[in-house]
Each structure stands twice: as structure tokens, then as C-alpha cells.
UniProtKB/Swiss-Prot annotation:
Molecular function as annotated in GO: 4-hydroxy-tetrahydrodipicolinate reductase; NAD binding; NADP binding; oxidoreductase activity, acting on CH or CH2 groups, NAD or NADP as acceptor
Stated name of the protein: 4-hydroxy-tetrahydrodipicolinate reductase
Domain of life: Bacteria
Primary location class: cytoplasm
Keyword presence, NAD: yes
InterPro entries reported for this sequence: DapB_C, DapB_N, DapB_N_CS, DHDPR_bac, NAD(P)-bd_dom_sf
GO CC terms in record: cytosol
The keyword Amino-acid biosynthesis appears for this protein: yes
Biological process terms in GO annotation: diaminopimelate biosynthetic process; lysine biosynthetic process via diaminopimelate
């Protein structure tokens, strides 16, 4: 990297918890430079991104609520590598954010969950036509990728499985993108799980969770005090096999975020999932 210019990075959702951690990680990465910080919260407009993130030194990058001028600015810096936008915003905003970034030739790295399957298909088509890399990653934790791989291995030997995901009460969407992705991975094994032993009746709608395909149920918990946690519970006569991953601090995601920023520059289309770039 010594002979290359640094990767210009825009952090969208800069004042959020993941945005702040990303700013710190990008500033500390020798091969990256923070070029823009965007957040719609009026409390942080004009404030230095480094100050908001808790860095000791200012970044001289003010937070703005206008994404497109930042995209245009970074796209116009031709002496730099192609820009990357890291998006930790809101399910209602992320689709338009990604389309705007791709339109400017900026590579999106998306950690915001809540995109529908149809929206992901549309973004994949848009990215492919633009020959622009895009990464959508429900969970940047390498430990979570290992849990998912272990779950795939276990699914060959167990016919009953349910997923419980637990997050902080500021998370807007449920179930989590990671839980949905885990269920999809298991569904791709080509078997139907959880054949009922009896005819089930829900006394309260949703008591048995949401069906994610092939009989796999997902249960969501939202409480203050939690960050991000997931259990995949397999059952068979006489035994229970539980896989669990706990995030105790958001710094756990930063190796995955930095890896995604570097890898997205090598892509010409949309890729879904951290496991695809490890």
C-alpha cells in the first residue's frame, strides 16, 4: 500500500454508534483517508467528525446532512483511488443512498439492514450495469461468520433448528439481517426442518416466531443493555446443540469493516455477505 494513494472513505450515519467506530477505524488505518461524514441528526451538523467519534485529534471533516455533494466531491478527486461509502443509516434511507453512491461511481459498503429481497435484486442489477462494486454485509463480525459455518455443518445431522436474535432496543428492523441470512444459509442445504410432531396452535399471534423458509423460525428480542447476539439451537431426541455469538463492543466489527472497504474496490458487482470476501 506504500506506493498507492489512500482509499477515500465517506461514512454515512457518522454520528451513530457504528458510524463513530467506523470513523475511528478509518482514521487509524494507514491506507485510508476520511473524506466525508454524513448524518441527518441536526445536533451534529458542522461538528468535526473526529470530535463526535471521540478522537483526540480533529479530522477537519465536518459532519453534514447532505450526501450528494459529498459523493460528487469525492468522485471528482481523480488523483485518488475510487471512493467508498460506508452506510450505517436507516432501513428507510439505505436503498436511495446506495443508488446515489453507485451513480457517482462510489463503492458502497452497506451495514444497514432492512433491505428487501427485491431491493437487493434491483441494487445488484444497478451495480452490475455500472460495473461498480457493492458490498451488503448484515454482520461484519468474523466470529458470526464462523457461527454460520458451524451451523451449516450441524444442519447435516439435525432436523430441528430455531434461531434467536437479540439486539439493543434502538434497532429498527426485526428480525435482524444476520438472522435472516443464517436461516437462508440453512434453507439452502436442501432439506425441510422442524417437521411438526403435533398440530400447533398459537394462542397469541407470533408466539412461535417468524417463518423464514424451510420450516426455520426466527425469534427476535429487543432490550436495552444488549448489543448484538444470536443463538442457533439444534434439537434431536436426547440432546440440544447450541451455537451462540455475543458482541460485547462494536470494535468487534471493525476488522470486517476495514476488510470490506479494501475488497469492494476489487469488485464489479454486488456481493452479499462477509463470508464471500474472507
Amino acid at each position: 500500500m506504500a506506493n498507492q494513494t489512500p482509499i477515500p472513505v465517506i461514512v454515512n450515519g457518522a454520528a451513530g454508534k457504528m458510524g463513530r467506530e467506523t470513523i475511528k477505524a478509518v482514521v487509524q488505518a494507514a491506507d485510508m483517508t476520511l473524506m466525508g461524514a454524513v448524518d441527518t441528526n441536526p445536533e451534529y451538523q458542522g461538528k468535526d467528525a473526529g470530535e463526535v467519534a471521540g478522537l483526540n485529534e480533529p479530522t477537519e471533516v465536518p459532519i453534514t446532512d447532505q450526501l450528494e455533494p459529498i459523493l460528487a466531491y469525492v468522485a471528482g478527486e481523480r488523483h485518488l483511488q475510487p471512493g467508498v461509502m460506508v452506510d450505517f443509516t436507516h432501513p428507510d434511507a439505505v436503498y436511495d443512498n446506495v443508488r446515489s453512491a453507485i451513480a457517482y461511481g462510489i463503492r458502497p459498503v452497506v451495514g444497514t439492514t432492512g433491505l428487501s429481497s427485491k431491493q437487493i435484486e434491483q441494487l445488484a442489477d444497478f451495480a452490475e450495469k455500472a460495473s461498480t462494486g457493492c458490498l451488503i454485509i448484515p454482520n461484519f463480525s468474523i466470529g458470526m461468520v464462523l457461527l454460520q459455518q458451524a451451523a451449516i455443518a450441524a444442519s447435516q445431522y439435525f432436523d430441528h433448528v430455531e434461531i434467536i436474535e437479540l439486539h439493543h432496543n434502538q434497532k429498527a428492523d426485526a428480525p435482524s439481517g444476520t438472522a435472516i441470512q443464517t436461516a437462508q444459509m440453512l434453507a439452502e442445504m436442501g432439506k425441510t426442518f422442524n417437521q411438526p410432531a403435533v398440530k400447533e396452535t398459537e394462542k397469541l399471534p407470533g408466539a412461535r416466531g417468524s417463518l423464514a423458509g424451510e420450516g426455520i423460525r426466527i425469534h427476535s428480542v429487543r432490550l436495552p443493555g444488549l448489543i448484538a447476539h444470536q443463538e442457533v439451537i439444534f434439537g434431536a431426541p436426547g440432546q440440544i446443540y447450541t451455537l451462540r455469538h455475543d458482541t460485547s463492543d462494536r470494535t468487534a466489527y471493525m476488522p470486517g469493516v476495514l476488510l470490506a472497504i479494501r475488497k469492494v474496490l476489487q469488485l464489479k458487482s454486488l456481493v452479499y455477505g462477509l463470508e464471500k470476501i474472507l
